[in-house]
Amino acid sequence: MKELLQKRLSEGTIIETNTYYGGGRDTTERHRQTLQVNGWADFTTVDITDAEGTAMLPVPNGKWFTEMSVGKNMLQYDSLLTLTHFKGHTMGGFGGSNKNLGIGCADGKIGKKMIHAGETGSQWGINNEEFMERMTESTQATVSHFKDKIAFINVMRNMSVDCDCAGTSAKPVVTPDIGIVASLDILAADQACVDCVYALPEESKHDLVERMESRHSMRQLTYMKEMGMGNDRYQLIDMDNGDKVITAAEAVKGVKGTWVSDGN
């Protein structure tokens, strides 16, 4: 990341929002302290976009929302490169570009509450398919705002079952590193990653697939398609091998995880 930002994206800015839950990033002051401790402030500019307020973006064709609350400063930028660590997620089942944008661009106090709680009165009152749809509608607000000036990169490496936003240590990673998926189509990017996970041997994918299916996470993909956000039919191009078109099964051929049976 440091090399990328300094040599290739030296004029770029990382954007963040404060978190909905407590911890080291729930207020702007603590968030900036966390960025400093982790070294980000030493080599790049980080804009906590909801530090100075929020803005509402329209949600085209939304079922749950007509608009979504985002960090106000995000509207200052004319393009967005979405860099995502693809992995499991406590509520989303998996976290790809859709989760990164849907939760990550919604501001910490209003937008994230709209997704997670709605009118339930409970901080985490929304789950399963409804959560996937609300999160996807939030993503739609950001994707529609940037139009054709947005791209998506999913890094399929160190794919833990839980996201680091859970605030607890995840189980040991057993899913092997696969590679990096990039696209101008958010649905194609996330669909390709999911297809690669499913193409893994059972012992390597078991925990991650169980997490995805138990959370109804495929609704992320089907709802993106219903909302016209992208195409789930794609070509997987292997840039390391002469731009050859490959299948998900070919992409994961020969990779091995470190899964060890617990005897049960």
Mark where each language-model region is.
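Extended, low-polarity segments enriched in aliphatic/aromatic residues
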Residues: 3-264
